[in-house]
């Protein structure tokens, strides 16, 4: 992903892990109280406390995505959770593994951008019917104005989003024409 200020060094992800309960209890490791991303935070928290870790190529977890999963559900506080997600990770590594902070921050910035893109998608396509056009426009405007999001919100990075009307819409957000696009989308979906 392109960053206007600096290039990220890594993008990361976890699948599944087995944990020792005594480490969880002793170190008081907890999940974040958010709906999306709480599992990776738990995993990082655990790994920073563990003395050893074993990896395998064997698939022990199958992540199922469908339209009823949390991945696609609308959450009215998704943007706030994204900010909490970012600051929690940053604080964790700042406190427990400062020598990795630049490495982690680069990956977190990419993840923050992707979650903001997801927040726009949720606002457009998964918001409840009682959510007004004005509310949707305000939320998308708040995301667009976010400084950290703007660092990565480039036309070059838009090519990493799925082709189709969502990418077209993101281009309209980029050139600040999203208000009319939300109104048009509302009219199309209400027919």
Roles of regions detected by a PLM:
Residues 1-56, 61-79:
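Donor-binding/catalytic cores of nucleotide-activated saccharide
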Residues 8-9, 97, 101-102, 176:
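Glycine-centered secondary-structure boundary/capping sites
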Residues 58-67, 73-100, 115-149:
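Catalytic core of nucleotide-sugar-dependent glycosyltransferases
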Residues 101-110:
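All-alpha amphipathic helical-bundle segments outside canonical DNA-binding/catalytic cores
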Residues 125-191:
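Membrane-interface aromatic/basic loop that binds lipid-linked glycans or pyrophosphate carriers
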């Amino acid at each position: 992903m392109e960053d206007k200020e600096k290039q990220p060094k890594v993008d990361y992800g976890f699948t599944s892990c087995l944990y020792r309960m005594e480490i969880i209890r002793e170190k008081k490791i907890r999940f974040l109280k958010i709906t999306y991303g709480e599992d990776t935070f738990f995993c990082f928290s655990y790994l920073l406390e563990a003395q050893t870790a074993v990896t395998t190529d064997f698939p022990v977890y199958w992540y199922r995505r469908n339209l009823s999963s949390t991945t696609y559900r609308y959450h009215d506080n998704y943007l706030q959770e994204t900010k909490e997600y970012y600051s929690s990770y940053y604080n964790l590594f700042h406190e427990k593994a400062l020598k990795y902070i630049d490495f982690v921050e680069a990956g977190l910035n990419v993840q923050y951008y992707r979650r903001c893109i997801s927040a726009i998608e949720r606002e457009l396509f998964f918001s409840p019917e009682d959510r007004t056009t004005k509310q949707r426009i305000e939320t998308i405007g708040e995301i667009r104005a976010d400084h950290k999001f703007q660092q990565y919100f480039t036309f070059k990075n838009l090519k990493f989003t799925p082709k189709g009307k969502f990418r077209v819409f993101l281009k309209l957000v980029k050139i600040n024409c999203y208000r009319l696009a939300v109104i048009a989308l509302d009219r199309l979906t209400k027919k």
